[in-house]
Design a protein with these regions (language model features):
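Glycine-rich loop(s) and the adjacent beta-strand/alpha-helix scaffold that form part
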Residues: 34, 47, 183-254, 441, ...
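FAD cofactor-binding and catalytic pocket of flavoenzymes
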Residues: 60-61, 222-230, 234-355, 410, ...
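Redox-cofactor-proximal catalytic regions of oxidoreductases
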Residues: 58-125, 339-347
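Conserved redox-cofactor binding core of oxidoreductases
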Residues: 102-179, 401-406
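A glycine-rich dinucleotide-binding beta-alpha-beta segment and adjacent secondary-structure elements
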Residues: 162-173, 324-335, 340, 352-447, ...
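Short, solvent-exposed loop/turn and secondary-structure capping segments
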Residues: 50-53, 81, 87, 205-211
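Extreme N-terminal leader/targeting segments of oxidoreductases
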Residues: 1-16, 34-35, 470
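N-terminal Rossmann-like FAD-binding beta1-loop-alpha1 element of flavoenzymes
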Residues: 14-41
Length: 471
């Protein structure tokens, strides 16, 4: 049901009020709906994005210049960034949950429902590629959350949606929220049994920090709100030439069953296994090896000839140009969770007086080292097996500044855990020391992984809805 006027519900007591209508908020409401439990979603934006919302999305980055804006990476509309994302999905692997208060099996029971929400059709695979690297795949979702779910919400008996409704703080003390303050043409107080903050990786920290500043009596502990902020830096690490027929031969000989046919999927996805990560003292990443058609006049042949003349000579002599492809190796990096990388409140405010966020973010030398070690591993493997010759970018071997593209996977800030010193929410996503405040979305990730987050966000949201239905 669409709520156009809050006068209709100002005296109603809901089971759950969900603040934010991105993938996390929508998935939680859908999970509650399955159990015939009523919820209210309040969304600060409209059905579609309008420029008048841009001042609310502004903020600043402190640190590396790669990430110069916050407004372009967030969405204030029904569906949130679920209308902006690229659709890539893959799961966090079992060993990556090592420091989380939950395990992979705790989310596996929600695989079917998450795939339905995201329209995912393919099976996720992870298999050994060589002694140190694993091959994995990504599935692609065509879902734009606003488009897919607005009519569903409009007809629902259990999901209420109020657009243009801005959260302005919480009433209560001693860990219990009694009502939240909202603005929709005028101020309202809305009541519920449970309150779920689902506003995205940066906005969750921003609103929770602001709530704490305005109502410190609500919180029992001095929680690290905003700390351990992470992203997924994406950058080019190498390029060269590969003999695809030899790569196929290696896969067949070594029983690599799920390697993609480049006529269907032009990218190999590789990551490190846990033994290699531990031995090299690095953090993991996803290597994207992209194949492109090549011809003998491409400049890449001249570049590779300089470092591997015999390899190129053999291509011409054996007339295997048709089997030779250009490869560009990109990396999507996990970041170590650091207390000093954080979301704070800026001195500037949005049009309603709520402080804008400030993201303190930078790349570390451990991340450079990790990118170098992982890239060297695949380059050495290709050389040893005479499959390819690939040159590595120089910046991985020195301390020069280097650019990365924004991953726009804003992670951490309200991370989960059992210790109030290094986490904000518990294993059930309840804020430590509170009885009815929960947080949902990528901000609860304890570590960043190298995987795209939305699939895990949806599973966590479904798990939260199941938990709320039981307590």
């Amino acid at each position: 049901m669409i709520i156009n006027n809050l006068e209709e519900i100002k005296d109603k007591f809901f089971f759950a009020i969900i603040i934010g209508s991105g993938p996390a908020g929508i998935s939680t409401a859908l999970g509650l709906e399955e159990k015939k439990i009523e919820s209210l979603i309040i969304e600060a934006g409209e059905l579609n994005y309008t420029s008048k919302n841009t001042p609310y999305l502004k903020g600043t980055y402190v640190g590396d210049p790669d990430y110069s804006t916050l407004a372009g990476s967030r969405g204030r509309q029904f569906g949130g960034t679920g209308n902006l994302w690229g659709g890539n999905c893959n799961p966090i692997q079992e060993e990556e949950f090592e420091n989380w208060p939950i395990k992979k099996i705790d989310l596996d029971k929600y695989i079917g429902r998450a795939k339905k929400i995201l329209n995912l059709k393919n099976k996720f695979v992870l298999e050994k590629f060589n002694n140190n690297l694993d091959l994995y795949n990504r599935d692609w979702s065509d879902v734009k959350f606003g488009n897919k779910y607005f009519n569903h919400f409009k007809k629902s008996k259990y999901i209420n949606l109020s657009l243009n409704t801005i959260y302005q703080g919480s009433d209560g003390d001693n860990g219990k929220i009694t009502s939240i303050n909202c603005f929709k043409k005028k101020n309202y107080k809305l009541k519920s049994k449970y309150f779920i903050l689902s506003c995205g990786g940066i906005e969750n920290s921003r609103l929770l920090l602001w709530t704490k500043n305005n109502n410190p009596k609500l919180f029992k502990y001095d929680l690290p709100i905003g700390n351990y902020y992470m992203d997924h830096p994406f950058h080019r690490v190498a390029e060269g030439l590969v003999n695809y027929k030899k790569l196929q031969s290696y896969n067949k000989k070594n029983n690599v069953k799920n390697a993609p046919l480049i006529t269907c999927d032009s990218t190999y996805n590789l990551s490190c296994n846990k033994d290699f990560i531990k031995a090299k003292k690095i953090i993991n990443s996803g290597l994207y090896i992209g194949f492109e058609n090549a011809n003998k006049y491409d400049s890449i042949f001249k570049q590779v000839r300089c470092m591997a003349p015999n390899f190129v000579k053999k291509i011409y002599e054996d007339k295997t140009v048709k089997d030779t492809y250009k490869v560009k190796v990109n990396i999507l990096q996990e970041q170590e969770p650091l207390f000093s990388r954080k979301i704070t409140l800026n001195k500037n405010s949005d049009p309603l007086g709520i402080p804008l966020p400030e993201a303190h973010w930078w790349k570390t030398e451990l991340e450079r080292k990790s990118a170098r070690v992982i890239t060297e591993e695949i380059v050495k493997f290709f050389l040893k097996n005479d499959i390819a010759r690939i040159g590595i970018e120089e910046y991985l071997f020195n301390r020069d500044e280097y650019d990365t593209q924004a991953g726009y996977h804003q992670l951490g800030g309200t991370r989960m855990g059992s210790n109030t010193k290094d986490s904000v929410v518990d294993k059930n996503l309840k804020v430590h020391g509170t009885s009815n405040l929960f947080i949902n979305g990528s901000s609860v990730f304890r570590t960043g992984s190298y995987n795209h987050p939305t699939y895990t966000i949806v599973k966590l949201a479904l798990r939260l809805s199941n938990h709320l239905a039981k307590i």
